[in-house]
């Protein structure tokens, strides 16, 4: 993963983007008390999910709640005679990157599966299902044949050199695809994971749709496995650095959970030698996601998965303070800090794993795990995860929320095109490439559209945050930061 941080920096430099937008919701609620801050987790969850409506591409539905957005990119794929409308803009730009979009959909689906009752209890399950479906529908359209998958819409270089609203952008909508001749196992397998996870979400409420999702997932997994080749050879942005074995295990784990078919478990057992001990969970590295899912199977009696369970424990040991094998340090203020490029993506995903892993231990009446001479109970793991959520919501040295629209102090200059340029509804005149840069990107004013729920890249290793639109490493939100946070905030609505 040595090249990972370099890639992120180069990518974000070229993107010069930031998400933000005005939604019709109240400000985040934070009540003071003599003790620690008492955060309104239900409100934070609602806003974390609402963020995805501000990232939508395509024809917006009548139920759209983020009112500063309008229809956009309605001709995506038209020149190739394929309908690639819909899906999500990745971060602060107007490009649809399929791989991180699929990962975000996987995480949202995992949250819906793991915390269905908690999310439903605060009336957010329907909104979450809509967010999942928006991503899944795009992936279904992008899978046009058993061995053809569209993976990106938009010219990253051209888009990142401009600063335009998605509603009137005029940069090329170039499409990219993988097939048997130019494979991308990582992406095909991630699409498979996302669709199989989503199939579980919809199984009880739309059986036909769930079946369609699972069918495409199986086909995509076969494509990924039988036409192995790294996406690093077929991608312009979001290239793979960790290889494709993690995605194959991740997809097989979800397919086993969704279908119950023993062939997927056999595949995992036969290939569990691929499993590695890791210290991050990200759009590029899914090992601990698969390991966590399969740890549940181990405790359920699948003892052949012992190596994978041990590898999952190694991740916990790598991030827990006080662990003898700790690899990820915390800032002076207590935030897990993996690297200084959109660090909160790693914090939210690690926190998600910590919460779910602790829940698995409780469900299976396991006392805890050992990290050398250190022992951590499920309660201790959950307790540390909670500190990460609280840090993001405001319990930090900057005394600010890193979620836009939550609390009284939060980022106002999100690195996000649509948020930083007046809505087309109030400023219908076209904002061109250079005008966007000079008039809005370089502006010292707050973004005119408050992108409620957007979580930015976060502070530096010393807990400092510069609220500047140009600081893409810290001021830009992404779909996968929010997707992981949905599970983490949902966990705090649960008792264990």
Swiss-Prot record:
EC number per UniProt: 3.2.1.4
Keyword terms, alphabetized: Carbohydrate metabolism, Cellulose degradation, Fruit ripening, Glycosidase, Hydrolase, Polysaccharide degradation, Signal
Enzyme class, spelled out: hydrolase
Signal peptide region: 1-23
A GO molecular-function descriptor: cellulase activity
Stated family: Belongs to the glycosyl hydrolase 9 (cellulase E) family.
UniProt protein name: Endoglucanase
Annotated organism of origin: Phaseolus vulgaris
């Amino acid at each position: 993963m040595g090249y990972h941080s370099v890639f992120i920096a180069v990518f974000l430099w070229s993107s010069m983007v930031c998400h933000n937008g005005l939604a019709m919701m109240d400000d985040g609620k934070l009540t003071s008390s003599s003790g620690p801050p008492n955060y309104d987790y239900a409100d934070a969850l609602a806003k974390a999910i609402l963020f995805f409506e501000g990232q939508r591409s395509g024809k917006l539905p009548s139920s759209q709640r983020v009112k500063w957005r309008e229809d956009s990119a309605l001709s995506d794929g038209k020149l190739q005679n394929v309908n690639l409308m819909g899906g999500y803009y990745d971060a602060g730009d107007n490009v649809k990157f399929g791989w991180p979009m699929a990962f975000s959909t996987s995480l949202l689906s995992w949250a819906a599966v793991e915390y269905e009752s908690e999310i439903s209890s605060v009336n957010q399950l329907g909104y979450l299902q809509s967010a999942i479906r928006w991503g899944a529908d795009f992936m279904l359209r992008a899978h046009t044949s058993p061995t053809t998958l569209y993976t990106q819409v938009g010219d990253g270089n051209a888009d990142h050199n401009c600063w335009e609203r998605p509603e009137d952008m005029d940069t090329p909508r170039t499409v990219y695809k993988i097939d048997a001749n130019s494979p991308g196992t990582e992406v095909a397998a991630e699409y498979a994971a996302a669709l199989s996870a989503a199939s579980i979400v919809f199984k009880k409420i739309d059986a036909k749709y769930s079946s369609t999702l699972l069918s495409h997932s199986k086909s995509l997994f076969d494509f990924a496995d039988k036409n192995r080749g790294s996406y690093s050879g077929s991608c312009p942005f979001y290239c793979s650095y960790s290889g494709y074995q993690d995605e194959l295990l991740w997809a097989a784990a979800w397919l086993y959970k969704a279908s119950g078919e023993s062939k997927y478990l056999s595949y995992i057992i036969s290939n569990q030698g691929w499993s590695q001990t890791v210290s991050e969970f990200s759009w590029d590295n899914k090992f601990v996601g698969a390991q966590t899912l399969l740890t549940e199977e181990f405790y359920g009696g699948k003892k052949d998965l012992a190596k994978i369970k041990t590898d999952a424990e190694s991740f916990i040991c790598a991030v827990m303070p006080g662990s003898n094998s700790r690899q990820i340090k915390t800032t002076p203020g207590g935030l897990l800090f993996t690297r200084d490029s959109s660090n909160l993506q790693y914090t939210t995903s690690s926190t998600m794993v910590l919460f779910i892993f602790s829940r698995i231990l409780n469900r299976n009446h396991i006392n805890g795990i050992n990290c050398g001479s250190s022992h951590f109970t499920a309660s201790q793991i959950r307790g540390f995860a909670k500190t990460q959520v609280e840090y993001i919501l405001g319990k930090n040295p900057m005394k600010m929320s890193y979620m836009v629209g939550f609390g009284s102090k939060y980022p106002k200059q999100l690195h996000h095109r649509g948020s930083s340029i007046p809505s087309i509804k109030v400023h219908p005149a076209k904002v061109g490439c250079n005008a966007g840069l000079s008039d809005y990107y370089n502006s010292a004013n707050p973004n005119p559209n408050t992108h409620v729920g957007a979580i930015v890249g976060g502070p530096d290793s010393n807990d400092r945050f510069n609220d500047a639109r140009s600081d893409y490493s810290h001021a830009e939100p992404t779909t996968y930061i929010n997707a992981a946070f949905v599970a983490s905030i949902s966990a705090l609505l649960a008792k264990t």
